[in-house]
C-alpha cells in the first residue's frame, strides 16, 4: 500500500492513490478452483444442487476471471455442458424415439434450461467481464447453442422431431385428437434455440410444414371441387382458413399464421378461381341470377384475399351484366315501349346496386365495372337518349300514376344515373326540349316545381349551357301568361269579339323551343284564324319589329263536338252513352282535345258529310306525313277515340279513302283526348333521321367552336393533340369521331381560320 502524508510547499489538496498489489495464482491453485466449479456444474446438471454454496461458487468464478483465467473457465464450461448433453441427454432422447419422444425431449429441454439459469448465476461475473471483452456468447446462450447442435439438430433426432410434428398436424387435420401442448412446447423450443431469430424454427419445422400443407391442400381442393357447389366450397375454404389460424394460435409460433394462410389461399383459392366462379348451376352467374347476396358476399370476402381474385369475379360479372343489358337494349322489335325499355334498365341497375351494397362492400373495382358496362350497352342503341327523355316525360306528365312527389323525385334521380352513362347528351337535350315543350304547351306538367327540379339536376350534371334554353322556355311561358292577361284586358276595354273562340297564345322565342323554320303549312279554319289575327295586331302594336310565325305542329285545341246518331251494339240494340252530355233523344256532346292539324280536319265536317283523302289534303294544305298521322288518330285509333269513320276499314291511309263523322261515337268521358298515333313509341324513322340531321348540324358548329377556342389560346398545335383536346372538351355532351373533327378542321382551313405550317402539314396555326 502506498504511504500517506502531506506534501510541503504546496497548497494543493492531497489525493489518496491506492494501487492494487500484484496477486499471482499458481496453476495448481487455478486447477483446484476449476475442479471445484466443474464438479458443481456437473452436480447442477444431475439435479444434485441442494448442498452447493452458490455464494462460494460465485466467489471462485469471480477469482478465476479476475486473475485472467476467464478463458479456462469459459472453455471448461463448454466442454462440461457438451459432454453432459452428448453422453446423458442425447442418449436418453435417442432411447425414447419410439416411446414418449416429445415428452422426453421436452423434459430434457426444461431441465437444461433450469440448469443453465443456475450456472449463469454462478458465472455472472464472467458474463459481465470476459464475455463482454472477448465478444463471445454469454453463458445461457452458449448452453442453448450446445443443446441445439448436440441434441435437437443431431441427425436422427432432428429428422424424427420434424416428422413427429408433421404427422401429428396431419392427423389433427383428419379429425384426430392430438397432444397440442407437446407440439406447442416443441415449437417454442425451436424458436428459443434460434437466439432472437427464426432460422431454427423455420428450417427444422416451418418450411417442411408449409410444403406438406401445400400437398395436403392440393389434394383437398380436388376433393372439395368434385363434391361441392361453389357456395359450399367457399364455406369449406373459409372454415379451413379459420382452422389453420386457430392451430397456429394454440400450437405453433404466431409468425407462421401469415405463411400458412397464404398456402391455403394459393392452393384452395388462387389456383381454382376460374373454376369456382364459372361453376355450372352454382357459380357467380348462378348467384347473380338468383339474387344470392349472402353467397356473393362470401365469395367476395374470400376472393379479396388473393391477387387478381376480385378481378376474376369482376370479369365474370361483367360478361353476365353485358349480356343482360344487350338483351334489354337490342334493337329487335321496333314496337318497344320507351317507358318499359328504360324501366328495364333501371331495374337491372337497382339489382346490381344491391349486389354492390350487400355483396361487394361498395368496392371501387365493381362500381367502375358496373358503370362501364351500363355505359357500353346503353349506347349500343341510338334510341336510348330519346327513350330516356320519353321515360322522364311519362313521369312528369299529369296522370293517375299514384306516385308521390318523393317517389317521382327518386325515379328521376335513378334516370339521371342512366343519363350520366349516355355519350350523346346533346341528342337527349334535343328530345328533352321537344317533350318539355309538349308538356308546357298542353299544360300537362305534373308541377312546375318537378319540372324545375329536373332541370336543376341536368344543370348540376352538365352546366348552365346545357339548360339555358330549357330555362328560357319557362321564362317564355311566364311572359306569355302576362301577355294573355293584357290581351284579355284589351278585348274587354275595346269590346272586340273573338267570335266565340277562347284563344290562348304562347309566344315562343326562336332558339329556345323546338320550332321549325320551315313551318308545315296548314289552312286554319276562318273563326280561329280571325281570333289569331286580332291577337297578332295587338302583339305587334306592342312589340314593333317582331315577327310571329304560327307553329301549327305545336298547337292544340278543345273542340265542342255534337254527335247525333244512335249508338248501337252489333245486334242492333241501342246502348247507354256514359259520360256524354245528352241533349234530345240521341244527341251527345263531348269536348275533343285535339292538335291544330286534327282541329283543321274536323272543322271541315261542319260544311260537308264526306271527304276523300285528296279533298282533305287540298282543303287543309297539311303536309302528307302530318295529315296521315292526324287521320290515323281520328279514324283508326281506339274505338273510344274514333270520331271519324273511313272506307275501306283498313289501318292504312291512302288516296281515294273516304272519311265521314262517326255518328255512333261514344265515350264514358265528357272530355275526350285524341291521342296522336305512336306518340309514346317515339319518333318514326323519317322523323328520327331528321332529328339526327339537326343534331349533326349542331355538332358541326360545336366542334368548330371548340377548335377555334383551343387554337386561339394555343396558337399552334399538332393534329393528334388538337383532336384529343377537342374530344376532351366535348365529351360531356357527345363523343365526336376523329374523322368528323378532321373534316371540321379542313373546313376552318378553307375559311382561313386555321392554316397548315409549311414544314409539317400535320401542324396547324391559328390565323388571327
Curated annotation (Swiss-Prot):
Source organism per UniProt: Xenopus laevis
GO biological process terms on file: cell migration; COPII vesicle coating; embryonic cleavage; endoplasmic reticulum to Golgi vesicle-mediated transport; integrin-mediated signaling pathway; mitotic metaphase chromosome alignment; negative regulation of Rho protein signal transduction; positive regulation of mitotic cell cycle phase transition
Domain of life according to the entry: Eukaryota
Quaternary assembly: Component of multiple BCR (BTB-CUL3-RBX1) E3 ubiquitin-protein ligase complexes formed of cul3, rbx1 and a variable BTB domain-containing protein acting as both, adapter to cullin and substrate recognition subunit. Interacts with btbd6.
Region (Disordered): 677-698
Pathway the protein takes part in: Protein modification; protein ubiquitination
InterPro entries noted in UniProt: Cullin, Cullin_CS, Cullin_homology, Cullin_homology_sf, Cullin_N, Cullin_neddylation_domain, Cullin_repeat-like_dom_sf, WH-like_DNA-bd_sf
Protein name in UniProt: Cullin-3-B
Boundaries of every Cullin neddylation domain copy: 698-760
SUPFAM superfamilies attached to this UniProt entry: Cullin homology domain, Cullin repeat-like, Winged helix' DNA-binding domain
Keywords per UniProt: Cell cycle, Cell division, ER-Golgi transport, Isopeptide bond, Mitosis, Nucleus, Transport, Ubl conjugation
Amino acid at each position: 500500500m502506498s504511504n500517506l502524508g502531506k506534501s510541503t510547499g504546496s497548497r494543493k489538496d492531497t489525493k489518496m492513490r491506492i494501487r492494487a498489489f500484484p496477486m499471482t495464482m499458481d496453476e495448481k491453485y487455478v486447477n483446484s478452483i476449476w475442479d471445484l466449479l466443474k464438479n458443481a456444474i456437473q452436480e447442477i446438471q444431475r439435479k444434485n444442487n441442494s448442498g452447493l454454496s452458490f455464494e462460494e461458487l460465485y466467489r471462485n468464478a469471480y477469482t478465476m476471471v479476475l486473475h485472467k483465467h476467464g478463458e479456462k473457465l469459459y472453455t471448461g464450461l463448454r466442454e462440461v455442458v457438451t459432454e453432459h448433453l452428448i453422453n446423458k441427454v442425447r442418449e436418453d432422447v435417442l432411447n425414447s424415439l419410439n416411446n414418449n419422444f416429445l415428452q422426453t425431449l421436452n423434459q430434457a429441454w426444461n431441465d437444461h434450461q433450469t440448469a443453465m439459469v443456475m450456472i449463469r448465476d454462478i458465472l455472472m461475473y464472467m458474463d459481465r467481464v470476459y464475455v463482454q471483452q472477448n465478444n463471445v456468447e454469454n453463458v445461457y446462450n452458449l448452453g442453448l447453442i450446445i443443446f441445439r447442435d448436440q441434441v435437437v439438430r443431431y441427425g436422427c433426432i432432428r429428422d424424427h422431431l420434424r416428422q413427429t410434428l408433421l404427422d401429428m398436424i396431419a392427423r389433427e387435420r383428419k379429425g384426430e385428437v392430438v397432444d397440442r401442448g407437446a407440439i406447442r412446447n416443441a415449437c417454442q423450443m425451436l424458436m428459443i434455440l434460434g437466439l432472437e431469430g427464426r432460422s431454427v424454427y423455420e428450417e427444422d419445422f416451418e418450411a417442411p410444414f408449409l410444403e406438406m400443407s401445400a400437398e395436403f391442400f392440393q389434394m383437398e381442393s380436388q376433393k372439395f371441387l368434385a363434391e361441392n357447389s361453389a357456395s359450399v366450397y367457399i364455406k369449406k375454404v373459409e372454415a379451413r382458413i379459420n382452422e389453420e389460424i386457430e392451430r397456429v394460435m394454440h400450437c405453433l409460433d404466431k409468425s407462421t399464421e401469415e405463411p400458412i394462410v397464404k398456402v391455403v389461399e394459393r392452393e384452395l383459392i388462387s389456383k381454382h378461381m376460374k373454376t369456382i366462379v364459372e361453376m355450372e348451376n352454382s357459380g357467380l352467374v348462378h348467384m347473380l341470377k338468383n339474387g344470392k347476396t349472402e353467397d356473393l358476399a362470401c365469395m367476395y370476402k374470400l376472393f379479396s384475399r388473393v391477387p387478381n381474385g376480385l378481378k376474376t369475379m369482376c370479369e365474370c360479372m361483367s360478361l353476365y351484366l353485358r349480356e343482360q343489358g344487350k338483351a334489354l337494349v337490342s334493337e329487335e322489335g321496333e314496337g318497344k315501349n320507351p317507358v318499359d325499355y328504360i324501366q328495364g334498365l333501371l331495374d337491372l341497375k337497382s339489382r346490381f346496386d344491391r349486389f354492390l351494397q350487400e355483396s361487394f362492400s361498395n368496392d371501387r373495382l365493381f362500381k367502375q365495372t358496373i358503370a362501364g358496362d351500363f355505359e357500353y350497352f346503353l349506347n349500343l342503341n341510338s334510341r336510348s337518349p330519346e327513350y330516356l327523355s320519353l321515360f322522364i316525360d311519362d313521369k312528369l306528365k299529369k296522370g293517375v300514376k299514384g306516385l308521390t312527389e318523393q317517389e317521382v323525385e327518386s325515379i328521376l334521380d335513378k334516370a339521371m344515373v342512366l343519363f350520366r352513362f349516355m355519350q350523346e347528351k346533346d341528342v337527349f337535350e334535343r328530345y328533352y326540349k321537344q317533350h318539355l315543350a309538349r308538356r308546357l304547351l298542353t299544360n300537362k306538367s305534373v308541377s312546375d316545381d318537378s319540372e324545375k327540379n329536373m332541370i336543376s339536376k341536368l344543370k348540376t350534371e352538365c352546366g348552365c349551357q346545357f339548360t339555358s334554353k330549357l330555362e328560357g322556355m319557362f321564362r317564355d311561358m311566364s311572359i306569355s301568361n302576362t301577355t294573355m292577361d293584357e290581351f284579355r284586358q284589351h278585348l274587354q276595354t275595346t269590346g272586340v269579339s273573338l267570335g266565340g273562340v277562347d284563344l290562348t297564345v304562347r309566344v315562343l322565342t326562336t332558339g329556345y323551343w323546338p320550332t321549325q323554320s320551315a313551318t308545315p303549312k296548314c289552312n286554319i279554319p276562318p273563326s280561329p284564324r280571325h281570333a289569331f289575327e286580332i291577337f297578332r295586331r295587338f302583339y305587334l302594336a306592342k312589340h314593333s319589329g317582331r315577327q310571329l310565325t304560327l307553329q301549327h305542329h305545336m298547337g292544340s285545341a278543345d273542340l265542342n263536338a255534337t254527335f247525333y246518331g244512335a249508338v248501337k251494339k252489333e245486334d242492333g240494340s241501342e246502348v247507354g252513352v256514359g259520360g256524354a252530355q245528352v241533349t234530345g233523344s240521341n244527341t251527345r256532346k263531348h269536348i275533343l282535345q285535339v292538335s291544330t292539324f286534327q282541329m283543321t280536319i274536323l272543322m271541315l265536317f261542319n260544311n260537308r258529310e264526306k271527304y276523300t283523302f285528296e279533298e282533305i289534303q287540298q282543303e287543309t294544305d297539311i303536309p302528307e306525313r302530318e295529315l296521315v298521322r292526324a287521320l290515323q288518330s281520328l279514324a283508326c285509333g281506339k274505338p273510344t277515340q274514333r270520331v271519324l269513320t273511313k272506307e275501306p276499314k283498313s289501318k292504312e291511309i291512302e288516296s281515294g279513302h273516304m272519311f265521314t263523322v262517326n255518328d255512333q261515337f261514344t265515350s264514358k268521358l265528357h272530355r275526350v283526348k285524341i291521342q296522336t298515333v305512336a306518340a309514346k313509341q317515339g319518333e318514326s324513322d323519317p322523323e328520327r333521321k331528321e332529328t339526327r340531321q339537326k343534331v349533326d348540324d349542331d355538332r358541326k358548329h360545336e366542334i368548330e367552336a371548340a377548335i377555334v377556342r383551343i387554337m386561339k389560346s394555343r396558337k399552334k398545335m399538332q393534329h393528334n393533340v388538337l383532336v384529343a383536346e377537342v374530344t376532351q372538351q366535348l365529351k360531356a355532351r357527345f363523343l365526336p369521331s376523329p374523322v368528323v373533327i378532321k373534316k371540321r378542321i379542313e373546313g376552318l382551313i378553307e375559311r382561313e381560320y386555321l392554316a397548315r405550317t409549311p414544314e409539317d402539314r400535320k401542324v396547324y396555326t391559328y390565323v388571327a
